[in-house]
């Protein structure tokens, strides 16, 4: 059995790490590099960095901090933010990132997924999906430009259908960002994760809702996700990654030690 991954998420805006609730009202958490170092030292398996306004601003992620992060940590990390071309992705990988993640650009140009997978290998290509449960329709809908409150909008895609589409096009991994749960710390949306897991045959990462250690255990044991991503519980030192791994091991969850 492959070990389950614990992945701190660092949302980056104007060169600093920020955190919001349900993708809104972001507060500044701190500088990128010291946080990355701290998580690597605590035992994180991987880090994910989202430049949350890059796509909505029409620019590519700022690569200067990518190089600085690569110099100080020895665990894999993934970078997302406005990557629209193979050239954009190549530069980020050259600066030291192990993976690139695309979200809004993939919705605008689904062929980009295939182009990147063919050029760099599927193991480098992550597709992030921002999924929102619409109580009026009773459906999970994919959203775009979620880093900008004024531009964020629903797309034509239902979540399950988009998951299947991105896999066909070459996504090597999917991060499911459950918008309703984001930052509220009352647990991952297990029902949604199980729905997606049924059709997802690539590694699936849960994102949005972690507040207690048991929430990680529930995601791993009840939905069989490959990794769990969290932000505020790590940023605010509510949960220590080393202690979380000890707890998960006690719950018979295979983790890297």
Swiss-Prot record:
Cross-referenced Pfam families: His_biosynth
The pathway where this protein functions is: Amino-acid biosynthesis; L-histidine biosynthesis; L-histidine from 5-phospho-alpha-D-ribose 1-diphosphate: step 5/9
Q: Where in the cell is it found?
A: Cytoplasm
**Catalytic reaction equation(s):** 5-[(5-phospho-1-deoxy-D-ribulos-1-ylimino)methylamino]-1-(5-phospho-beta-D-ribosyl)imidazole-4-carboxamide + L-glutamine = D-erythro-1-(imidazol-4-yl)glycerol 3-phosphate + 5-amino-1-(5-phospho-beta-D-ribosyl)imidazole-4-carboxamide + L-glutamate + H(+)
Which UniProt keywords are given for this protein, alphabetically ordered?
Amino-acid biosynthesis, Cytoplasm, Histidine biosynthesis, Lyase
Q: What is its EC number?
A: 4.3.2.10
Annotated GO molecular function terms are: imidazoleglycerol-phosphate synthase activity; lyase activity
Q: What Gene3D superfamilies does the annotation carry? A: Aldolase class I (3.20.20.70)
The active site of this protein is located at 11, 130
Gene Ontology cellular-component terms for this entry are:
cytoplasm
Q: Which HAMAP family match?
A: HisF
Q: Can you state the subunit structure given in the record?
A: Heterodimer of HisH and HisF.
NCBIfam families listed in its UniProt record = hisF
Q: What does this protein do?
A: IGPS catalyzes the conversion of PRFAR and glutamine to IGP, AICAR and glutamate. The HisF subunit catalyzes the cyclization activity that produces IGP and AICAR from PRFAR using the ammonia provided by the HisH subunit.
Q: Which PANTHER family match?
A: IMIDAZOLE GLYCEROL PHOSPHATE SYNTHASE HISHF, IMIDAZOLE GLYCEROL PHOSPHATE SYNTHASE SUBUNIT HISF/H IGP SYNTHASE SUBUNIT HISF/H
- Record-given protein name: Imidazole glycerol phosphate synthase subunit HisF
- According to its UniProt entry, this protein's organism is Aliivibrio fischeri (strain ATCC 700601 / ES114) (Vibrio fischeri)
Taxonomic lineage = Bacteria, Pseudomonadati, Pseudomonadota, Gammaproteobacteria, Vibrionales
This protein's gene is called hisF
